[in-house]
Every structure is written in structure tokens, then in C-alpha cells.
Amino acid sequence: MSAKTIIQITDRGDPRIAPFIGVRERDLTGGADGRFIVEGKVPLSILLTQSRFEVDSLFLCETRLAPLASLLKDVPKGVPIYTAPQSLMDEIAGFPIHRGILACARKGSQMDLSAILSGQRILVLNQLSNHDNVGAAFRNAAAFGVDGIIVDSQSCDPLYRKAIRVSSGASLWLPFHHGGRGEDHVSALKAEGFAVWAMTPRTDAAALYAQPVPDKLAIVLGAEGPGLPDGLIAAAHPVRIPMSPGFDSVNVATAGAIALAHVFSAEH
């Protein structure tokens, strides 16, 4: 720990910890300054060891320094580690940071869509505005071997603090492209030879378990409630998950997990 830059914070107005002031308000800005916040031990570990993102600084409750000593060895040289008592940290952040662990990182350049299209298994998120659902979708994608994720411009940022936490840090290392329209994504995927499954509860859609798994496959998930736009479904291959009579849908992240598990089990 002696080789690391440990800085004790005693004043909530200290400009050095500006990125951590009012974390929830920062969430609302969507990281307009090109930085984002990571919360918790597991996401921090991934940020330091597996992520493609550059770490700016850490802000830890002083009681967390010793328990995190082995992990903090992975903090890049020159990255400051700010520390404060729990009460001051909570005051600075604007709410109780029960885990006592925050980090600030830089988004860097957007990953190009062509990099995602080089994979074989792609997940596409269309108009998912719920951070929990986006985070869970990333976690499921990581669990079932997805190569990359395409997130349309109307979906929430996968680097939103809560989305990162719910993803168990998967959004920090799993390749993704954020932007554009779902219909355009489907066209780009088909042009690259992908079969595109549009997950929908429509009764005229093909049953998931009857589908052979193609070599190149993209699975598209839409928002709960409205689902996928009709035009997007028409441009893809509509697929439904068979369910008990009288029930036609599950949570979007659950639907994604079921579809991805079907594909994964067919290959393993």
C-alpha cells in the first residue's frame, strides 16, 4: 500500500473529489463529461483487472483500505486513492455508500459497430430504458458466451452506475456499441450474414425450442410493455418462448436468459 497514492479527504468541498460529489445527480447527466462511476468490490475488481476503460481515481471508506489491500495492488501507478470516514463519504456522495467503494473511470472512444459484428453471437437491446434490465441483460450475455452487445440510442447507458453493478461488472469488459436505431442494426447484422431472432410474445412467432441454432446469430430484446416495433419484427425472424396458457411474457432480462441458454445448451 505504501507505493500507492493514498489521500485523506477531510472537506466535502475538496475539488479533488469533484467526480464523487452528488453521485445520483451525476447519474442523471449520463456521464456528459466522459466519465462514469463504478460502485462495489466486484465491479472495481473487474475495472482494475479486465476492463478496457481507464481508471481516473478511487474513493474509499477508510475502513475498506485494509480489506482491499490485495486488490488495490492492481491500481495503476499515479491513480489517486481518496479515503474518508463513512459519514463524510456518504455526505459527499449524497446517499449512504454501504459498500464504501467508488471509482471514477473514463469512457474513452465508442467501440465501432464493425468490431461487434465480427463476433458469432450478438445480443441486441432495443429501447431498454430500465437500468436493472440492461445490467441483467449484460450479466446474462456474459454467462452464456455472447461475443458482443448492440445497444440502441434509446436504451440507457450500460455504463450507468446501477447497470454496471447489476451486470456484476460485465458491462466493463463485454464489448458493446451504444447508439443508432434498432432497425438499422438488424439491417447491418443481416448484411453480415447473421440470422436475427426478434423475441416477441406474438402467437404467430416461431417457438424458441424448435429453432435450430445458426452459425451466426443475433437475438433482439425489446422494452417490457411495448416490445419490439412491428417494423423491426418484420425485418427479422420472430421467435417466442412457449409458456403456460393465459401467460405470454416474462421480464425482458429473463426472456433474454432463456433464449441465450437455449443457444448455449445447443452448442455445449
Q: Residue spans of the language-model regions?
A:
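Short beta->alpha connector loops at strand-helix junctions that form conserved
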Residues: 84-85, 126, 152-153, 175, ...
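Active-site/ligand-binding-proximal alpha/beta "capping" segment
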Residues: 197-247
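Short, aromatic/basic amphipathic alpha-helical patches
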Residues: 66-78, 231-232
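RNA substrate-binding interface of SAM-dependent RNA methyltransferases
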Residues: 108-204
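Short acidic-hydrophobic, aromatic-tinged amphipathic segments that line or gate anion-handling sites
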Residues: 7-11, 80-85, 174-182
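Boundary-proximal intrinsically disordered activation/regulatory segments immediately upstream
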Residues: 1-67, 155-157
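Structured adenosyl-cofactor binding patch, chiefly the S-adenosyl-L-methionine
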Residues: 100-103, 140-144, 158-171, 230-268
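Amphipathic alpha-helical repeat scaffolds
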Residues: 40, 129-137, 250-255
